[in-house]
Design a protein with these regions (language model features):
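Flexible, glycine-rich active-site loops centered on histidine and acidic residues
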Residues: 16-35, 99-168, 290
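Active-site mouth loops of central-metabolism enzymes
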Residues: 25-37, 97-105, 187-196, 251-265
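Catalytic domains of carbohydrate-active enzymes, especially glycoside hydrolases
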Residues: 41-58, 203-214, 273-280
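Hydrophobic faces of well-ordered beta-strands that scaffold small-molecule active sites
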Residues: 21-25, 55-57, 92-94, 122-126, ...
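N-terminal beta1-alpha1-beta2 module of alpha/beta enzyme domains
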Residues: 1-86, 189, 287-290, 299, ...
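Short, acidic/polar
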Residues: 34-47, 110, 193-203, 262-274
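Conserved, mostly hydrophobic/aromatic
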Residues: 59, 83, 114, 124, ...
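An alpha-helical appendage that flanks or caps ligand/catalytic pockets
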Residues: 1-17, 143-187, 214-323
């Protein structure tokens, strides 16, 4: 068993040839303004109760009006810590931390603290970043993103493993046997590359615990998954998916940006196909602002989630639903 597989939430969220479902947060309105924190907490708790496996947030340090209307972005670690106090089992994920803009020491301490506070529920998506205006603001050489990403990942793994790791790279060095005072429970937190992160698939397979990709044409995703899952050791694959959930459960599929407009029965059949080709987790992003989040969470919870339960719950109900 790998260090990642010892992590309780990793096991609860990911298993070979099985799919689970999560949600993208924060929850927002039609103008992409996030709801009040009390509402975020209530909806997160509801998602936890009905069997969603994860809540994922993005990390964008800066905003520019040139981006247009985008969802409100809070500091991911602070926001997830808040949600952790209002939920019990659901995974708390990042999609994704811009690893190149954060010092590894700060990352190591923040992630360790959140994983311990939440009872080992953190799933750490990591990215190189794609907003070009952020790199000069942080004095980051955009030509060195690949190397910076690699060294950040390696530094985190070392700092989680030992109170006095030996680290001496282009980013920083440690002296006088220094390190974190408190380590993660399993001396590791599951990490997932987002996209290629300017790496090769071979590097990602070797150094990361899984892969977070993007929605793309089904046959393209199928081919990518065949290549990803070709090794003997399981590492999960996941991606977000925008869903404009029609109130008609039988509404047929219509493409939208990053996903589909469809009814719940069509969604269920589509998700079964994603599971069949090897997708292990999908984070749904609800974009229908004519319906309440409560309504959509409850509908998916009643009619779709039972086919894609978190794995601890699947064991308890293994004689129930026939998949």
């Amino acid at each position: 068993m790998t260090l990642a597989e010892e992590h309780e939430t990793f096991q609860r969220t990911f298993q070979p040839q099985k799919l689970t479902l999560g949600l993208i947060v924060p929850f927002d309105n039609a103008t992409h303004d996030a709801y009040a924190f009390a509402t975020q907490a209530r909806l997160a708790s509801l998602a936890d109760d009905v069997g969603f496996s994860s809540l994922f947030v993005r990390d964008n340090p800066l905003y520019s009006p040139h981006l247009g209307d985008v969802t409100t972005k809070y500091d991911p670690f602070v926001f997830l810590t808040y949600l952790s106090t209002h939920t019990t089992n659901i995974a708390l994920g990042t999609s994704s931390i811009v690893a190149t803009l954060r010092h590894p020491i700060h990352l190591a301490k923040a992630t360790t603290s959140l994983d311990l506070i939440s009872n080992e529920r953190l799933l750490l998506g990591m990215a190189t970043g794609d907003r070009k205006f952020e790199f000069p603001a942080f004095d980051i050489d955009s030509d060195q993103l690949s190397t910076t990403f690699q060294q950040t990942i390696e530094s985190l793994q070392s700092m989680w493993q030992s109170h006095s790791p030996h680290i001496d790279n282009d980013l920083f060095s440690l002296y006088e046997e220094s390190g974190l005072q408190v380590l993660p429970k399993h001396r590791h937190i599951p990490m997932f590359a987002t996209g290629y992160a300017q790496q090769t698939m071979t590097w990602i397979k070797k150094h990361m615990d899984g892969w977070m990709f993007y929605p793309q044409a089904f046959q393209q995703q199928k081919a990518l998954l065949a290549e990803w899952h070709d090794s003997t050791h399981f590492k999960p694959f996941m991606h977000p998916l925008a869903i404009d959930l029609d109130s008609n459960p039988n509404a047929l599929l219509k493409p939208i940006k990053g996903g589909y407009h469809l009814g719940r029965n069509t969604l269920l059949q589509m998700l079964k196909q994603y599971e069949k080709i090897g997708t292990n987790h999908i984070m749904l992003h609800f974009v229908n602002y004519n319906r309440t989040y409560e309504d959509m969470i409850l509908e998916i919870g009643e009619h779709v989630i039972p086919y894609f339960l978190p794995h601890s719950i699947q064991e308890e109900h293994k004689h129930g639903i026939i998949r």
